[in-house]
Every structure is written in structure tokens, then in C-alpha cells.
Amino acid sequence: MSAPRVSFVSLGCPKALVDSERIITRLRAEGYEIARKHDGADLVVVNTCGFLDSARDESLNAIGSALSENGRVIVTGCLGAEPDVIREKHPNVLAITGPQAYESVMAAVHEAAPPSHDPYIDLLPPQGVKLTPRHYAYLKISEGCNNRCTFCIIPALRGDLVSRPAADVLREAEKLAKAGVKELLVISQDTSAYGIDIKYQTSMFGDREVRAKFLDLSEELGKLGIWVRMHYVYPYPHVADVIPLMAEGKILPYLDIPFQHASPQVLKNMRRPAHGEKTLERIRGWRDVCPDLAIRSTFIVGFPGETDEDFEMLLDWLDEAKIDRAGCFKYEPVKGARSNDLGLEQVPQDVKEARWHRFMQRQQKISATQLAKKVGKRLPVLIDEAHGTSAKGRTKYDAPEIDGSVHIQSRRPMRAGDIVTVKIERADAYDLYGSAV
């Protein structure tokens, strides 16, 4: 009897990608083959995103394509928390489960296409089959979020903060490092809140106890001898405790912090945990300790009630903060978000567009200035793609997918996963260019 074949679609953020990796691990362990195409597979699993309307549309379209090409579809992920929305457009899906519902997904798969042999779960590592390149991996340390930002529905989709025991996280990280992973990208909904829900409980890792706390976890990960990059860090005061580890080279001098805005009134309406002036003070303090710290962030323009004065305050804040990398989103109402019920005046779409363009132009100049400081330096670069003597990679200041790249020429062939020293010869607003030395 041939093994059942499952095609898989993974949409959304890195947290959802980790969920997909875990499901695929279970499928592989139970003897299922992962098909590259929907056509010819026994069924299709679609891991959806449901955060923004554009993401919901993408998910619904992906479900429709899978139904058209295969006809037997199981839906999971964040949009799965709204089964009525899915059934209304696609009534013929086989089953719908919400996010992180691994057992429910497997039960639906078993019913639709029974496994060809008994499962041997121990044959595969608990961290799962990786969907990223072999040289980097996402390390998810918690699920859910305790914050109640008015524009966000993640707590409704994924629940409150649930931190993993520190020893579990570290065992997974250690296995990844031993398997040849060169870079770990630490992710969650709120990385700096790690352990709060379990009162920083300790667990045994090897011969010692480790606390489930942001600082302690960072210290332990820093002992692995590979790149460790922190994502989704809220700007709490205790983030300052981790900066010395970056200055010492234990973890990468990089913080991904979603500041979202700078106007006190807009931040209050968003229910964000920081004030623009306070974050500027914190950024200055962090850079005093670690001068080469790179900061990436995301912002929202056109939030209900945002005035011209609020927006100008944001631009002024950008000039002061000198954020290295920044993404910007035009606010769009999300079904179920409390920002819909604040009674604030909606910002016209043309105003949102104009503000977005002004934001991006301002940030482009700042990014270009920051990158120009790298010209003439010799920097270690992790190769992501290689084509003989030309390659593309990243410095310790850039995360995959969301930041810039280093375009490299070399006299000798390079391979993905290599770390090479590159002399930076020029820069633009997004990327660096140089030669391997």
C-alpha cells in the first residue's frame, strides 16, 4: 500500500510557519508523503492567516485554489477560528480547526486519508521538519499574548500568553545548533514578556536549573556559539538588561520592536505600552551600551483619530530615533478589533496613502544614512543564496525576508550557510554591496 500524499500550504507570520513545521513533522512521522503539488495528492492542508482583511482574502483564495485543484481540503490556522466565514465561501472543505490545534488537524487527516502504518513519532525531532533553509530556523518560545492592543485580534485567535519551559526551548535550540543551523530567530507574540505567565518558573536543562525569563533565556542561547536574533520584543524597561549581551557578542546586536507610533494620543488609543519620548530615552540608553545596535520596527499610519499633528510627531520621532529598518502599514479595520468601536474619526484613504508615502520616503533617507556608515568596514555575512562566485547574504544587522541583503562577489565559490568576511564597498537605501576577503 502506497503512502498517502498530503499537499501543504503555509500562510502568515513566522509563528504560523512554526505551526506548519510541527504538523508536517507529525505527518512525516506517521508515514505521509508531502506532495509538492495539489494535483495528485490525497488531500490538501491549508494553514491560514486571519489578521488583516488582505490576509483573510489570501487565505480564502488559497482554500479556493486547493479545492479547485484537488477537492479535498482541511483548513487550520488563525482564520480557522472563524469557521462560519470559511464555510460561507467554501462549504465543501473537509474540516476546519483553529490555530495550534495540532491534534485536531491530525484527527481530520486520519479520517480523510488514514496512515499506511502505525506512527513512530520518536523517529523525528520534536522541533519538527524545517520549512526554512538549513542554515537558519525560527525558535518559538511562547504562544498567545496578554496585551490588548485595540487594532489586534491575535489574543482572540491564539489566546493569552503561554510560555514554554526554558529547558524545552533550550533543548530544541541545542538540537538545531548541532544539526548545523547557524542562526536562530527567536519569535513569539511578545518575546520580552516570556515567562511572566508561569512566574519565571525554573526547569532542569542538563545539570542546572534555568529560569523562564527573557534575560536568562538570552544568556543561555548566547552560549550556543551561533547567531541568535530577537524578534517581537516589546519596549519594556527590562529590555535594557539584555543589551549588554549584545555588546559582548553573546547574541546579535539586533532588536525587532513594534513601536507602531510616537504620538502619545495615538499610542493611548492603540493601548500600546510605551510613550514616544520614553522610547527615545530607552533607545539612547541601549545605544550607549551597544553602539552598533540595529533596530527594526513596524508602524501604523492612518489609525482612527490620527491628526496631521500626530503624524508630524511620528516623522519627527523617526528623525530622532534613527531606526535602521522600518515597515509601515496603512491602517485597515479588522473584524473583531476594538479599534472599530472607539468612536474615533476615520482617516480618509487618500490621506492614509499620502502619509504612508511620506513615512516611507523619510525612513528611506534614514536607512540610507545608517547603511552608508557600513561602507569601508569588513563584516561577517551569512550566505543565503550562492551562485558560484556571486552570492547574497545578510550581516548580523539584518533578518531574513524582512530586512536588506549584502550582494557579494568572490574569487572562490560560496555556499548557502557559509559565513564569510565581506568588505563593504557601497550602499543604497536597502542593501549593501561588497567583496569577500
UniProtKB/Swiss-Prot annotation:
Binds 2 [4Fe-4S] clusters. One cluster is coordinated with 3 cysteines and an exchangeable S-adenosyl-L-methionine. InterPro entries: Elp3/MiaA/NifB-like_rSAM, Methylthiotransferase, Methylthiotransferase_CS, Methylthiotransferase_N, Methylthiotransferase_N_sf, NA-bd_OB-fold, Ribosomal_uS12_MeSTrfase_RimO, rSAM. Gene3D superfamilies: Methylthiotransferase, N-terminal domain, Nucleic acid-binding proteins, tm_1862 like domain. [4Fe-4S] cluster 1 binds at C13, C49, C78. It comes from the Bacteria. Residues 131-369 form the Radical SAM core domain. This is Ribosomal protein uS12 methylthiotransferase RimO. It comes from Mesorhizobium japonicum (strain LMG 29417 / CECT 9101 / MAFF 303099). The gene is rimO.
